[in-house]
């Protein structure tokens, strides 16, 4: 009997790294390939992975700053080495973050087939360490090629970001009906990501009375956990508005939305593309790096509006300008269609060289 193939996935720390890995793990399982996840025993992956039905092995990993942490990091490499020898994976996929580094290093020492997946336009520091060694690096966006030497581009492949299976089949009309949204109502989703965004919350509060005055505007606002004015907002909101720290049905809400106000995290951008959602984007951080580069994926197609932290008032004015402009919203949705990459997990798995010893 042929031994079941096994793929080791490694990353952690944030949902932006973990959820793409879980999407690939889910697809591996469907194909009869065992997935084993190695991450930090202290970060969110220790709960998310087992809850998703996959094997999780926790390693004591810290950012290697200072002599004590460097020693701890070296110990993590030794632990990962033992784990890989015991698990005998046919391939290892790193999804970025410092948590993946000890596992990738141990995999290289054991001559395992190494693959990488990069969620953002800019390649992260962990993946930068290894992409010249990896058999293949899977990219979310074509724009990443701009920073890759031509001679190295054959070892990269654009697949899109693997997204949670819950996104499959979500339809605008169906989700609106489930949420009890009337045909005459427009839906605005406001989210700063899983941790919230104080800048976004503050500017929404500044315009809150105007939002409340529009009786045919349904607001779904994910504030994050540290929003001090949450109680006040809940007292003044319209009856059908939903104001919560986080929505467990976030993808369903996004599918039902007419417009999204959000950051430019890699998965948020990929979900906006897949669900064809017009967006007002307020990226986190510097205008020259990080989330701004992710946002350009949409602005290059005139499929979103992007505002800096110095343009927050302008961002809200644009919300009121286009939320009822059906023609503008339709054009933005159409422009998102060419960017869709719905089979990312499938393409990644198909590219793995795991059938030869």
From Swiss-Prot:
Q: What pathway annotation does it carry?
A: Cell wall biogenesis; peptidoglycan biosynthesis
Residues at which UDP-N-acetyl-alpha-D-glucosamine binds: 14-16, 120, 164, 194, 291
Cite a GO CC annotation. plasma membrane
Its EC number(s): 2.4.1.227
Query: A single GO BP annotation from the record?
Result: peptidoglycan biosynthetic process
Subcellular localization is given as: Cell inner membrane
Q: Which UniProt keywords apply?
A: Cell cycle, Cell division, Cell inner membrane, Cell membrane, Cell shape, Cell wall biogenesis/degradation, Glycosyltransferase, Membrane, Peptidoglycan synthesis, Transferase
Q: Which GO terms describe its molecular function?
A: glycosyltransferase activity; UDP-N-acetyl-D-glucosamine:N-acetylmuramoyl-L-alanyl-D-glutamyl-meso-2,6-diaminopimelyl-D-alanyl-D-alanine-diphosphoundecaprenol 4-beta-N-acetylglucosaminlytransferase activity; undecaprenyldiphospho-muramoylpentapeptide beta-N-acetylglucosaminyltransferase activity
The UniProt entry's sequence similarity note says: Belongs to the glycosyltransferase 28 family. MurG subfamily.
Entry's HAMAP family? MurG
NCBIfam families reported in the protein's UniProt record? murG
Reported function: Cell wall formation. Catalyzes the transfer of a GlcNAc subunit on undecaprenyl-pyrophosphoryl-MurNAc-pentapeptide (lipid intermediate I) to form undecaprenyl-pyrophosphoryl-MurNAc-(pentapeptide)GlcNAc (lipid intermediate II).
Q: What is this protein called?
A: UDP-N-acetylglucosamine--N-acetylmuramyl-(pentapeptide) pyrophosphoryl-undecaprenol N-acetylglucosamine transferase
Question: What organism does the record attribute this protein to?
Answer: Fusobacterium nucleatum subsp. nucleatum (strain ATCC 25586 / DSM 15643 / BCRC 10681 / CIP 101130 / JCM 8532 / KCTC 2640 / LMG 13131 / VPI 4355)
Q: What gene, per UniProt, encodes this protein?
A: murG
């Amino acid at each position: 009997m042929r031994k079941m193939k096994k793929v080791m996935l490694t990353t952690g720390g944030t949902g932006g790294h973990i959820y793409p890995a879980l999407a690939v793990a889910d697809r591996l399982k469907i194909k009869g390939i065992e997935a084993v996840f190695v991450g930090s025993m202290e970060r969110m992956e220790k709960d998310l992975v087992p809850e998703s039905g996959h094997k999780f092995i926790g390693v004591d990993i810290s950012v290697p700053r200072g002599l004590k942490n460097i020693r701890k990091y070296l110990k993590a490499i030794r632990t990962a080495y033992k784990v890989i020898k015991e698990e005998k994976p046919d391939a290892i996929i790193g999804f970025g973050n410092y948590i993946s580094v000890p596992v990738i290093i141990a995999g290289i020492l054991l001559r395992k087939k190494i693959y990488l997946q990069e969620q953002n336009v800019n390649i992260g520091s962990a993946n930068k360490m290894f992409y010249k060694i990896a058999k293949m690096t899977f990219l979310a966006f074509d724009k990443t090629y701009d920073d890759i030497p031509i001679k190295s581009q054959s070892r990269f492949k654009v697949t899109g970001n693997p997204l949670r299976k819950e996104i499959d089949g979500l339809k605008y009309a169906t989700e609106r009906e489930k949420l009890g949204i009337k045909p005459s109502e427009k839906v605005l989703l406001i989210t700063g990501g899983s941790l919230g965004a104080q800048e976004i919350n503050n500017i929404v509060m500044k315009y809150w009375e105007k939002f409340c005055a529009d009786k045919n505007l349904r607001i779904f606002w994910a504030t994050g956990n540290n929003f001090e004015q949450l109680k006040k907002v809940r007292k003044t909101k319209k009856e059908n508005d939903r104001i919560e720290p986080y929505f467990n049905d976030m993808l369903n809400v996004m599918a039902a939305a007419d417009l999204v106000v959000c950051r430019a995290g890699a998965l948020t951008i990929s979900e906006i593309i897949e669900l064809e959602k017009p967006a007002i984007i307020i990226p986190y951080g510097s205008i020259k790096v990080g989330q701004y580069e992710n946002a350009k994926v949409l602005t290059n197609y005139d499929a979103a509006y992007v505002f800096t932290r110095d343009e927050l008032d302008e961002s809200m004015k644009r919300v009121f300008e286009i939320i009822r402009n059906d023609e503008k919203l339709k054009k933005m949705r159409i422009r998102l269609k060419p960017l869709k990459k719905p089979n990312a997990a499938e393409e990644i798995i198909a590219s793995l060289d795991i059938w030869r010893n």
